[in-house]
Curated annotation (Swiss-Prot):
Plant non-specific lipid-transfer proteins transfer phospholipids as well as galactolipids across membranes. May play a role in wax or cutin deposition in the cell walls of expanding epidermal cells and certain secretory tissues. CDD domains: nsLTP1. It comes from the Eukaryota. The gene is LTP6. Residues 1-19 form the signal peptide. SMART domains: AAI. GO terms for biological process: lipid transport. Pfam families: Tryp_alpha_amyl. InterPro entries: Bifun_inhib/LTP/seed_sf, Bifunc_inhib/LTP/seed_store, Plant_nsLTP. Belongs to the plant LTP family. It comes from Arabidopsis thaliana. This is Non-specific lipid-transfer protein 6. Disulfide bonds join 23-70, 33-47, 48-95, 68-109. SUPFAM superfamilies: Bifunctional inhibitor/lipid-transfer protein/seed storage 2S albumin. Keywords: Disulfide bond, Lipid-binding, Signal, Transport.
């Protein structure tokens, strides 16, 4: 599953670069979170560092919407279990990072300010 997710992310990185924060950056920042999202357990420190970095880089509405679209595109083609979605939704709070969007396939990226 990791190989598939990585392949999807790399392909999407080529198509999501309109905001100042590129999909390559989003993928690099969130990649350390993959083990927690797919398997649970403790959240890796590098994952929380990536979320913090991502939040600090996405300063404008356009940036935040772009980050949201990259995340949605990366997870959109995957079959996600309810537990995987729950783990993704819990990430920001477990890391103490307040994000203006949720890691969910149902997030409306256009509504993010």
């Amino acid at each position: 599953m990791r190989s598939l997710l990585l392949a999807v992310c790399l392909v999407l990185a080529l198509h999501c670069g309109e905001a100042a924060v590129s999909c390559n950056t989003v993928i690099a920042d969130l990649y350390p979170c993959l083990s927690y999202v797919t398997q649970g357990g403790p959240v890796p420190t590098l994952c929380c560092n990536g979320l913090t970095t991502l939040k600090s880089q996405a300063q404008t509405s356009v940036d935040r919407q772009g980050v949201c679209r990259c995340i949605k595109s990366a997870i959109g083609g995957l079959t996600l279990s309810p537990r995987t979605i729950q783990n993704a939704l819990e990430l920001p709070s477990k890391c103490g990072v307040d994000l203006p969007y949720k890691f969910s396939p149902s997030t409306d990226c256009d509504s993010i300010q």
